[in-house]
């Protein structure tokens, strides 16, 4: 990580399982009020942990009915890595746009650093997403450390940058 902030530890399979059944902090309907994304591009089903101005943990249930599985790949469906990154970015967007100083602004992707893919995401997997705010500058640029896990196993992690626009 290029920041001085250490990434949080990976969640154990047991902790991930507990979060999978935790009551939502933000439901799908509430997420729709926060994010501009809509089906088929809304990639956060619910937020199960939220610390204002710091971090969020969310879930994406990956089903065989996802539109991207039709072509990625026939007879061997794998969730595209760019959509895993997008899911992490959407969760990061929730953390940023809920900040009092930036309420009502739109968080746009501005950069990706150090993203690595560790294992494929398959139909039936539940992505456990985490987004941790590292920095925000001039109420215009935010940097997050984001991670995706399945069953306690690391799938993807990296730093995402956002530009906040009116």
From Swiss-Prot:
EC number: 4.2.1.59
Record localization: Cytoplasm
Any one annotated GO CC term: cytoplasm
Protein name in UniProt: 3-hydroxyacyl-[acyl-carrier-protein] dehydratase FabZ
Family, per entry: Belongs to the thioester dehydratase family. FabZ subfamily.
Main location: cytoplasm
GO MF, one example: (3R)-hydroxyacyl-[acyl-carrier-protein] dehydratase activity
Keyword hit for Chaperone: no
PANTHER family per UniProt: 3-HYDROXYACYL-[ACYL-CARRIER-PROTEIN] DEHYDRATASE (PTHR30272:SF1)
A Pfam family it matches: FabA
Species for this entry: Synechococcus sp. (strain JA-3-3Ab)
Catalytic activity: a (3R)-hydroxyacyl-[ACP] = a (2E)-enoyl-[ACP] + H2O
CDD domains: FabZ
Keywords for the protein's UniProt record, in alphabetical order: Cytoplasm, Lipid A biosynthesis, Lipid biosynthesis, Lipid metabolism, Lyase
Major enzyme class: lyase
GO biological process: fatty acid biosynthetic process; lipid A biosynthetic process
Superkingdom of origin organism: Bacteria
Role of this protein: Involved in unsaturated fatty acids biosynthesis. Catalyzes the dehydration of short chain beta-hydroxyacyl-ACPs and long chain saturated and unsaturated beta-hydroxyacyl-ACPs.
Active site location: 72
UniProt cross-references to InterPro entries, sorted A to Z: FabA_FabZ, FabZ, HotDog_dom_sf
């Amino acid at each position: 990580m290029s920041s001085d902030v250490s990434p949080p530890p990976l969640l154990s399979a047991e902790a991930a399982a507990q979060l999978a059944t935790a009551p939502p902090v933000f439901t799908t309907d509430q997420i729709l009020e926060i994010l501009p994304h809509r089906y088929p591009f809304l990639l956060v089903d619910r937020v199960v942990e939220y610390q204002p101005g710091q971090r969020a943990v969310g879930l994406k249930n990956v089903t065989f009915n996802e539109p991207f599985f039709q072509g990625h790949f026939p007879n061997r469906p794998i969730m595209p890595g760019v959509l895993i990154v997008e899911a992490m970015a959407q969760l990061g967007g929730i953390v940023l746009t809920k900040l009092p100083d930036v309420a009502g602004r739109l968080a746009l992707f501005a950069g990706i650093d150090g993203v690595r893919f560790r294992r494929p995401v398959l139909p039936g997997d539940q992505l456990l997403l985490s987004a941790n705010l590292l920095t925000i500058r001039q109420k215009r640029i935010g940097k997050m450390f984001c991670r995706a896990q399945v069953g306690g196993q690391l799938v993807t992690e990296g730093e995402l940058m956002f530009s906040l626009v009116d």
